[in-house]
Amino acid sequence: MSGCRILLDAGNSSLKWAVVEDGTWLARGRSDYSDLSAVEAELDAGSECFIASVASRVYEEKLAALLTAAGCSAVWLKSEAAFDDVTNDYRDPTQLGVDRWMGLVAARARRRAPTLVVSAGTAMTVDALSGDGSFLGGLIVPGVALMQRSLQQGTAGGAAAGGAWQAFPRCTADAAYSGIIAALCGAVEGQHVRLAAHEGISPACLITGGGAETLLPHLGVDAEHVPTLVLEGIERVARAGGRG
């Protein structure tokens, strides 16, 4: 695989990866940090690895050791003030999660118009991109599992685990789960309304992350599911020499 670029999206709970050569995506997958054998099989001395990480220090060290042992070069990407015609209006651009930044870079390449970028993972982010490519800001909301854990630990009776979506739930487990889904979808829908008012036009909506398929059937806005969004952003920055 020498000469290939390895793209690594190191999230809180899993590693998403892709192998790209001359603009062609050869392979991609998702691995738990407990078993990185699928990623290891793609590594070879001379491969360039570009990493966007919000993972814990322990997971980052495990990943770094794997890349070093394989003889790969590693570029750990950071959020910056601008890339191409995307500008990062965060109060301190370096404090924006690099996964969010890569998602915005990819979204701008896909849509030259106002766009809401939703990443539904361990936490859900809902980021607003203006028509001229300015990142206006965004929300961070606990994801489904975090909200469930909070209810179980923070209520006297402990909300029942599991549950299924019901428009009018009639048991505690369903009520808790349906409330979580409604809250997450409401965050997306509210930001969609606010971005439309700001831009004077209904924005596109792109959604990525492991929880996307859970939310999509319940969203009150049209959204395109793009599982590779963060990896696409990494690939664009990698082609530009690793500065994003």
Curated annotation (Swiss-Prot):
Single annotated GO MF: ATP binding
Enzyme Commission code(s) on record: 2.7.1.33
Lineage: Bacteria, Pseudomonadati, Pseudomonadota, Betaproteobacteria, Nitrosomonadales
GO term, biological process aspect, one: coenzyme A biosynthetic process
Binding of ATP, residues: 9-16, 122
UniProt-listed NCBIfam families: baf (TIGR00671)
InterPro entries cross-referenced by the UniProt entry: ATPase_NBD, Type_III_PanK
Cell inner membrane listed as a keyword: no
Protein family (similarity comment): Belongs to the type III pantothenate kinase family.
Details of cofactor binding: A monovalent cation. Ammonium or potassium.
Top-level EC class: transferase
UniProt-recorded name of the protein: Type III pantothenate kinase
Protein encoded by which gene: coaX
HAMAP family associated with the record: Pantothen_kinase_3
